[in-house]
Regions:
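Terminal targeting/low-complexity segments that flank the catalytic cores of oxidoreductases
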Residues: 1-39
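Short, contiguous alpha-helical
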Residues: 1-15, 52-102, 138-172
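Short secondary-structure boundary micro-motifs
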Residues: 19, 29-31, 44-45, 67-69, ...
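A short small-residue
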Residues: 19-23, 99-107
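Solvent-exposed interaction patches of small proteins and small membrane subunits
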Residues: 25-35, 88, 109-117
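A glycine-rich, hydrophobic loop/mini-helix early in the fold
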Residues: 33-62
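Acidic/histidine-rich alpha-helical segments that form the ligand environment
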Residues: 40, 45-47, 102-140, 159
Length: 172
């Protein structure tokens, strides 16, 4: 049975804490984001070493491997989006269908150790990118096609919720 696509607009996490994982963007200091990314990436290695990493807990839920592959791609996508904000004036981000990507890239058939290495590399890259943004550039903006607008700061806050939430999903 295929996974039901997630169609929620998760930008609400910028306004109130996530009741599922406890993350609170409003309480997050921008300068903490790089360390949070690195800590999150490190926590995925033991999750991916589990013998059941590719086993879905039920037909409607991704396996830990699928969540990790998604997080790897989130790190890559947000690195690209941050680069766009810093390099262009109010860029429009390309749409990304995470569910179509999971199917097309066969997340659950990927090698867990390869995903762990790729996730760590992508995390290091996006952590370094967020760390390198000077305070004067943190109000630069970008937008999604649905009209959601982000500053560098709110992009960081919105972004870090995703890997945090998914680590909670797999109880990592």
């Amino acid at each position: 049975m295929p996974i039901t696509p997630d169609t929620k607009d998760w930008t609400w996490v910028l306004e109130r804490p996530c009741t599922e994982c406890g993350f609170s963007a409003a309480d997050l200091d921008y300068d903490d984001v790089p360390a949070l990314v690195r800590a999150n990436a490190a926590a995925w290695a033991p999750v991916l070493a589990r013998p059941d990493a590719a086993v879905r807990p039920d037909d409607a839920t991704w396996s830990a491997l699928e969540y990790a592959a998604h997080v790897r791609d989130v790190f890559r996508i947000f690195n690209t989006r941050l680069g766009l904000i810093l390099g262009e004036d109010d860029p429009l981000f390309a749409n990304w269908d995470q569910d179509a990507t999971a199917v097309a890239e066969r997340y659950n058939e990927q090698d867990p150790q390869a995903v762990a290495a790729e996730l760590a590399a992508a995390a290091a890259s996006v952590a370094d990118a967020f760390a390198a943004v000077p305070p004067a550039d943190r109000q630069r903006t970008g937008r999604r096609s649905d009209g959601a607008r982000f500053t560098v700061t709110t992009l960081a806050q919105y972004f870090i919720h995703d890997p945090t939430h998914h680590l909670h999903d797999v109880a990592g």
